[in-house]
Amino acid sequence: MRLWKSMAWGILLWHSQSGALCPAWPPARAAEEITRLQQQLADWNDIYWKQGVSAVDDSVYDQLSARLVQWQRCVGQDVSSTPVSPPLNGTTMHPVAHTGVRKLADRQAVEQWMRGRSELWVQPKVDGVAVTLVYQNGKLTRAISRGNGLQGEDWTPKIRLIPSIPQTTQGALANAVLQGEIFLQREGHIQQRMGGMNARSKVAGMLMRQDNASALNSLGIFIWAWPDGPANMPERLSQLAKAGFSLTNKYTLAVKDASEVERARQSWLTSALPFVTDGVVIRMAKEPASQHWRPGQGDWLAAWKYPPVAQVAQVSAIQFSVGKSGKITVVASLVPVILDDKRVQRVNIDSVKRWEAWDIAPGDQILVSLAGQGIPRLDEVVWRSRERSKPVPPDSHFNSLTCFYASETCQEQFISRLVWLGSRSALGLDGMGEASWRALHQTHRFKHIFSWLALTSAQIANTPGFAKGKSEQIWRQFNLARRQSFTRWIMAMDIPLTQAALQASGDRSWEQLLMRTEQHWWQLPATGERRAGRVIDWRNNPQIKTLSRWLAAQHIPGFGS
C-alpha cells in the first residue's frame, strides 16, 4: 500500500543544534510546549514520591524527561530545573552524598570511559529505589531515601520491617555507611523477555504507603557502595557477603575491557536474575574519600543502560494509504528512533476510526515497540502537543471493486492493485516493487491495471530512472507473465477467493468461471455464502468484464474463446 502523499499533513521540520534534533517551532510555541511538559513531569514526579503511585511507566517518564532536556537545550534554556529528581520532602542529611551515575550511550562511549582507568568492576544496574543505610555500634540506626542526594526522608521504620536487610552487623561493618538499591525480589526474572515491570514504581509505592507491612517482605537490597570501605574490592565484597549482603558479591565481576563489560551486560540481560535491571554499572575499586562525594560528580563510575523495549517517538506527520481492497489505513511518520537495532520511522495506526479514537496529531509523543517479526507497533500516546492540526482523510468511497482503472481520485488504490498483481501471490513479477510501478504509470499513463502488457521494450527502456539492466529485466518479467496460469491471472484481478479455493474449483477458463453458480462457490474451502456473494458481485462488475475481454485480446491463457 502506498501512502496518500497528497494528504500528508503537518510534517514537522527538524534541524540539528549541538547534535540534538530540534522541532522547528516558533519561540512562543517552543516556550509553551516546554512549560507544559515540564509541569506534567513535575506532577507525575510529585505523585510518585508523595503517594507512591506511578501515573506513567518508569521508562516513559525517563524518556520524556530526556526529551524535555533536549528541547530546553534547543532553545538555549537552563536545564537545571528539569524535574528528573525526587522533590525534596525529607530533611534528614545523608552522612555521605549520593553521587548518581553518569550514563554512557554505547560501547564506544564505554571504551572511551574505561581508557586510563584501572581496577574496574561491573555490576547489574538494579532497578529500584536508592537508599542510605547507617550502622552504628553494630546496629541499623538510620535509613534515608536518596532525595536530592544530600538529604532525603527518614525511612528507618519501614526499612526495619524488610527481612532481607540485616539489622545488625559486626567487624568493619559495625560502624559503616552503605548505599544501595531496594528492589522487588523476583524469581528467575529474565530482563530481555519480561522487561522492567515498572519495578521502581512498585518499590516506591510499598515504601510510601502506611498500611502494607506484609508487602515489604517482597523487597530486597543490593549494596553498590561502601564509602570509605576496604580499598581492595574482593575484601569489600567478602565482608559484605558475610554481613548478609550476598548479592553484591555474587553479581560484581572484574573487567579489563569493554568486551568483558558487554559480555556481562548481555548475560544479565538474558539470564534469570533475582531482580529487575536496566543496564550495568562499571566502577573503579579506588574511590575518593567520602567527604568529597557530591551529587552528579561520581566520575569513578558510569552506567551503560539497556535499550528500552519501547521508545517514545515524536509524530512528524499523519499520512493515509489506500489498499487494493479500498481500505484506508493511517500511518504515523516519526522522527526516527532505534528499537532493537532497527531504525523505526513510521508506525501503522490502522483504520481512520482507530486513528480518531487515538487522537494523534503531528507533534504528539507516542510509545512504539516491536511486535512479531520486528513490525513497529503503537502502544500508547504519552504526550499530546498543544496544537491539534490534523489532516482530512480521503473519501471513503473506495471498496474492493473500485480503481481497476486509473483516475485522479484512484491513484493510490490503483498503485496498490499494481503492487498486488506483481506480488508472489499473483503473477510473481520479480523486481517490480511499488517504486517501479509508480515510475511506469507516471511515464506511460496506464489506462487500467493490465496496460503494462502493451508496453514495448523501447518504452520500458525510456522510463526515467530505469537502467538498461533494470528495463531488460522488467521486459522479460512482463513476457513471462503471459505464460502464467489462468488461476494466477484471476488472482491478479483480485477475485475474492483464496488460491486454494480456486484450485479446488478446477476452473481453467473465464468461460467456465462464468458458468459457476453462487452455490458452487460457497461450497469451496474457506468460502461460505458471504464470500460466494462477493465472487458473484466481482464477476458481474463491468470493469472486470471489460478487463477479461482485454486479456482475451492479449491472448492470455484461459480468456480466449
Swiss-Prot record:
Catalyzed reactions per annotation: NAD(+) + (deoxyribonucleotide)n-3'-hydroxyl + 5'-phospho-(deoxyribonucleotide)m = (deoxyribonucleotide)n+m + AMP + beta-nicotinamide D-nucleotide
Name of a matching Pfam family: DNA_ligase_aden
Single GO MF annotation: DNA ligase (NAD+) activity
Catalytic class of the enzyme: ligase
GO biological process, one term: DNA repair
Active site annotation, chain numbering: K125
Entry keywords, A to Z: DNA damage, DNA repair, DNA replication, Ligase, NAD
Keyword Magnesium carried by entry: no
EC number(s) recorded for this UniProt protein: 6.5.1.2
Cross-referenced PROSITE patterns: DNA_LIGASE_N1, DNA_LIGASE_N2
Similarity section: Belongs to the NAD-dependent DNA ligase family. LigB subfamily.
PANTHER family on file: DNA LIGASE, DNA LIGASE B
Function of the protein: Catalyzes the formation of phosphodiester linkages between 5'-phosphoryl and 3'-hydroxyl groups in double-stranded DNA using NAD as a coenzyme and as the energy source for the reaction.
Stated name of the protein: DNA ligase B
Species the sequence originates in: Salmonella gallinarum (strain 287/91 / NCTC 13346)
Classification of source organism: Bacteria, Pseudomonadati, Pseudomonadota, Gammaproteobacteria, Enterobacterales
